Amino acid sequence: MGVGLHGDHVGGELNSANAFTETLFKMDYNNPEHKEMMDLEGLKRWIARRKSLKLPSTRANIKISDKKLPH
């Protein structure tokens, strides 16, 4: 087994990210302990990311080097 930068096994970062994602998806808006944080994020539930590469163009997709951003 390889060792990562911080003494963790190689791939540990991916394992941690997957565990974090799993925890987010278990959050329930009806749970008062979860509701406050979800309200801060403007969410009622977590949803999986899009798997399609064909994403609509949004202000967030535009390169910073572009001179004008659409309004």
Curated annotation (Swiss-Prot):
Tell me where on the tree of life, at the top rank, the source sits.
Bacteria
Signal peptide residues are: 1-21
Which keywords, in A-to-Z order, does the entry hold? Signal
**Protein name per its UniProtKB record:** Uncharacterized protein HI_0083
